[in-house]
């Protein structure tokens, strides 16, 4: 649970050392907003009561498979290639660093 905290701390520290004060301010502001919403979700889970009943309609297995395949094809063929190129470069840099 503390990995996210320390990673944000290191990013904010690097921004401050690079004199990117506005970016640091925006990051801290957005972290505070997201923390508020996460705390609200936890509060509802542990202390809230449902005011309504939800009805969940199960999806057939064939429909679930079709939705999964369609989503996968859309991501693989219509997503921007820069995402895959960036992840490939990062993995190569990590491999080169460990070698």
UniProtKB/Swiss-Prot annotation:
One GO cellular component term noted in the UniProt record for this chain: mitochondrial inner membrane
Keyword Transmembrane helix applies: yes
Membrane topology designation: Multi-pass membrane protein
Enzyme nomenclature, EC number: 7.1.1.2
Transmembrane portions of the chain: 22-42, 65-85
Main localization category: mitochondrion
Catalytic reactions of this protein: a ubiquinone + NADH + 5 H(+)(in) = a ubiquinol + NAD(+) + 4 H(+)(out)
Annotated keywords: Electron transport, Membrane, Mitochondrion, Mitochondrion inner membrane, NAD, Respiratory chain, Translocase, Transmembrane, Transmembrane helix, Transport, Ubiquinone
Functional summary from the UniProt entry: Core subunit of the mitochondrial membrane respiratory chain NADH dehydrogenase (Complex I) that is believed to belong to the minimal assembly required for catalysis. Complex I functions in the transfer of electrons from NADH to the respiratory chain. The immediate electron acceptor for the enzyme is believed to be ubiquinone.
Family listed: Belongs to the complex I subunit 2 family.
UniProt name for this protein: NADH-ubiquinone oxidoreductase chain 2
Species name: Cyanidium caldarium (Red alga)
